[in-house]
Amino acid sequence: VRLVGSEMCIRDRYKGYYKNKNLPTKTIINENGLLLNVDVENGQKTGYFLDQKSNRYLLRKIAHGKRVVDCFSHTGGFALNAAMGNAKHVVSVDVSKTALDQGYQNAKLNHLEDKIEFVQADVFDYLDELKENEFDIIVLDPPAFTKSRRTVQKAYNGYKRINKQAMKVLKNGGYLISCSCSRFMETANFEKMLREAASEAGVILKQVSVTQQNADHPILWTMEETSYLKFYIFQII
């Protein structure tokens, strides 16, 4: 918008991103030393969930020698960081074959394909089939289970189910990484769910780290919707 005297000139407004046949929409980014293929046009969000960058690095720091499963892995962000941190074995689980295929290409790009097993499965079913003590670290980073206040209780039940499943099969002393990216699942409610899941699973949660989104996704106190990501690392005792 540009004011000229008493008249207002308005340029045509474009919706979405400007698409040019000569503009590539696939690129490779570097995240803490990991090379990652990103499909800006067809991928979820901007092709990669940049808001979890610093949180994925936290996993890398505790992964050495551990058996790790990355649930709802998308293109393998957490799984790749676990492998980069010299985990003993890593499993990347997602229902989307397309996401898993891209995750495998990311693993190849970093010469980590021999360290990660890619499994196409429904995470709820996969967790049901796990044996106790099979993994040292379980990452739960699901898509938003609720995108409105009307479905919060349904989302609460879904979060509780997967967290309880994970708590029951993790080895004693193992780590649970639990996330929610829904702003409608408020922090107090999410923590209440975690306490209930732990009680029903018969475990105690020892808090290791609590964070939110990466700094390049700023939280504005005048806009409550900007505070949406909840990230917890617990040790199971």
List where the protein language model places each region:
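Single conserved hydrophobic/aromatic residue that forms the stacking wall/gate
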Residues: 1-10
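Glycine-rich adenosyl-nucleotide cofactor-binding module
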Residues: 13-86
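Short helix-capping segments at alpha-helix termini
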Residues: 86, 108-114, 199-204
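Conserved SAM-binding motif I beta-strand of class I
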Residues: 89-94
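S-adenosyl-L-methionine
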Residues: 98-139
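Helix-to-beta-strand junctions that scaffold the AdoMet/dcAdoMet cofactor pocket
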Residues: 112, 170-172
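C-terminal catalytic and target-recognition region of SAM-dependent MTase-like enzymes
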Residues: 134, 161, 175-237
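Mobile active-site "lid"/loop adjacent to the S-adenosyl-L-methionine
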Residues: 136-165
